[in-house]
Regions:
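Conserved, carboxylate-rich catalytic/transport cores that coordinate ions
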Residues: 2-7, 14-22, 26-33, 293, ...
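Long, charged N-terminal accessory/stalk domains
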Residues: 1-367, 395, 402-405, 409
Length: 659
């Protein structure tokens, strides 16, 4: 139940060593840079006494790298979209030093400029193409007009060109037929419009204009100096030129796909550098030296010192170590969990709820064995467990996984074992019952039948819940005793243990072994414990009646324990439900004709069992966590710690480890 002990490490070194030291501690990913000033008042007070000291101001460099990062991310997105198939890189492991050796800022800037130019050129071509497509569409409709639309100068007539909606065509032509002095010719008809040329006398201009407006006649806006057919050919030629330019640019762009991994590594480096630049803002700087304060886990101290001394000789750096003050423990100190490799994957359950405070017990080791049992009991299938085991091993051995995903793989790898064990106990293999004789030997499985031993499984679920509640209360009692809150430890822990054990003895003595002595002992123990719960608040309170009321109300909490125990019946319900569903899927396929059973049936079994595995794992994960958070943690755990936040890399594309 370990929370890492923290020390405050202060570093004083020459200003030129700052970058190397920050890179060294970032590569370790186990050092949190501490904010020296918690308020502007503290900063001002120090400056007033030591005017040569000032907080590091690295915003200019920070802005530079943030701008470069934004440009790079935009172009990575542009490259990915342009590839049409999505670009990816294989995840690898680097040290921070190896990673930063792949980075060349000058070369990157050159690539960024070239790619930006290609991107802008492609955008401009796209815009020009859209314009030409619109022009081509317009000119294609008028290409059979063999005169320049805007250059007809007639002495006594006007010539107009334009279009009307096809729905108005019949009535428009009928109206024009009433004007024998108006000549009209249809040039083209599209799906929705008809295109006309009209010639009419100047003295009829007003009447014809009114007619055209009545039918929403849209005049042609022509901007070319050549006839439409010639202009149409010119537009097509320009369009072909743009297509060739676009093809050449895309070929040039495709050549940059080979540099995708380089760009991804550059982004990783920029993310790391930005993290360091942000950390620099917490430093104190003089003209020739700097001061850096950090939180470090005590167990990592030797490794941290070694890494720093690799960058800076001992005689060129001053290091001091201090234990956290009481005020820092209450307000500032981070919390890092320290457990063995078997328990570490289960830390994520604690983190999802809340980290413990610095001086509080870590509930993860106490919670882990119960979660193992509960998860296995709720999934309880040999086949499902073997599948979990196989997939977890493949994921861990065949791939370099992101840390979060690796922790999940470790988590399900461990959980596969109780799933297999409970599968044997229930005698279930992908929902099918184990044969009574295996390899010529009579099988002892199932130990418990999900059809015949439902009540036994139900009682077993409640017993497991009872044990977990007892463990939670014992942890609470020990914590309160260590804090010398002895009356509270009795009232909030040991008395409730007495009630639980007393009630257990009552049940066993009355219903199981039929022993009056056990029954009487249980009644006495439960009664004395109940009296303690009522009396202790009276002792602690100056107002005795108020204390009595508080004690009686506290005793009412026994109903909550009944509810807690009932909650554990879900272990039985989910385990039996998952097995029954799997068995039903098998029966469904068995009813199929032989031909369908060994063709469609196999595919159907795979799909249905995949669905049941997903639902079983999800249900066990959620309900298992719920039992820990509500029933178990509620007995002793407060939480509220601040997570340890070391200076590290983002690890977006690679894993960074100290080599």
């Amino acid at each position: 139940m370990a929370v890492s002990k923290m020390e405050k490490m202060t570093i004083i070194a020459a200003a030129e060593k700052e970058a190397a030291i920050l890179q060294a501690i970032q590569g370790l990913q186990i050092v949190e840079v501490k904010r020296i000033f918690h308020s502007p008042e503290e900063e001002q007070a120090l400056k007033s006494q030591y005017s040569f000291l000032q907080a590091e101001q690295s915003t200019e460099q920070l802005r530079k790298y943030e701008t470069m990062l934004q440009q790079l991310q935009e172009l990575l997105l542009f490259l990915t979209r342009s590839s049409g198939k999505g670009l990816k890189i294989k995840r690898k492991v680097y040290s921070l030093e190896e990673l930063e050796q792949t980075f060349d800022e000058e070369t990157l800037q050159s690539y960024l400029t070239e790619l930006k130019n290609i991107q802008e050129s492609l955008k401009q071509i796209q815009t020009d193409r859209q314009g030409l497509e619109a022009e081509e569409e317009l000119l294609g409709r008028w290409q059979y007009l063999d005169v320049l639309p805007h250059k007809q100068q007639l002495k006594s007539s006007y010539v107009v060109h334009g279009s009307i909606n096809l729905a108005n065509k019949a009535s428009f032509l009928s109206a024009l037929s009433q004007w024998p002095t108006v000549y009209f010719e249809e040039i083209y008809q599209s799906m929705h419009h008809s295109y006309f040329t009209l010639v009419y006398l100047k003295e009829h201009q007003q009447s014809v204009t009114e007619l055209l407006n009545q039918y929403s006649f849209e005049p042609l806006q022509y901007r070319y100096d050549v006839p439409p057919k010639e202009a149409y050919q010119q537009v097509k030629e320009r369009y072909e030129i743009l297509q060739k330019e676009e093809k050449a640019l895309k070929q040039q762009l495709a050549s940059y796909h080979d540099f995708y991994e380089t760009f991804c590594l550059a982004e990783e480096v920029l993310l790391a550098v930005i993290q360091r630049e942000q950390a620099r803002q917490h430093l104190l700087n003089a003209s020739s030296f700097f001061i850096l304060q950090t939180w470090i886990p005590v167990e990592e101290k030797a490794e941290i010192l070694t890494a720093i001394e690799e960058k800076v000789p001992k005689d060129e750096i001053a290091l001091t170590f201090e234990n956290p003050t009481k005020a820092e423990i209450e307000t500032d100190i981070p919390v890092k969990l320290a457990n063995n490799k078997l328990v570490q994957p289960f830390e994520m359950l604690t983190e999802m709820y809340s980290l413990p405070k610095y001086e509080e017990v870590d509930p993860t080791p106490a919670m882990m064995p119960f979660y193992l049992v509960f998860f296995g009991m709720m999934v309880a299938d040999i086949g499902y467990g073997l599948l979990m085991l196989l997939l977890s091993i493949i994921a861990l051995k065949a791939f370099v996984l992101p840390r979060g995903m690796k922790r999940f793989a470790d988590f399900f790898l461990i959980l596969s074992f109780p799933t297999i064990i409970w599968g044997f106990i229930y005698g279930s293999f992908f929902g099918a019952a184990l044969p009574p004789i295996m390899f010529g030997i009579k099988s002892p499985f199932p130990i418990l039948s999900t059809t015949e031993d439902v009540n036994t499984i139900l009682i077993l679920s409640v017993i497991f819940g009872f044990i977990q509640l007892v463990v939670g209360l014992m942890i609470n009692g020990i914590q309160l005793s260590k804090q010398k809150r002895y009356l509270d430890s009795i009232n909030e822990s040991y008395a409730w243990l007495g009630i639980l054990f007393g009630l257990a003895l009552l049940v066993v003595g009355k219903l199981v072994v039929k022993n009056e002595g056990l029954f009487t002992a249980g009644a006495i123990l439960a009664s004395l414990s109940a009296i303690a719960i009522i009396v202790i608040p009276m002792i602690q309170s100056k107002a005795k009646l108020k204390g009595l009321a508080k004690g009686l109300y506290g005793l009412y909490g026994v109903t909550g324990y009944v509810g807690d125990l009932v909650s554990y019946t879900r272990l039985m319900a989910l385990g039996i439900a998952g097995g029954s569903i799997a068995s039903a899927f098998n029966m469904l396929v068995e009813f199929m004709p032989p031909v369908a059973r060994f063709s469609v049936g196999i595919l159907l079994l795979i799909v249905l069992h995949a669905l049941n595995i997903f639902l079983s794992l999800l249900g066990a994960y959620v309900h298992g966590a719920r039992l820990q958070y509500v029933e178990f943690f509620g007995k002793f755990y407060t939480g509220g710690g601040r997570a340890f936040n070391p200076l590290k890399t983002k690890e977006k594309y690679v894993n960074v480890e100290k080599k």
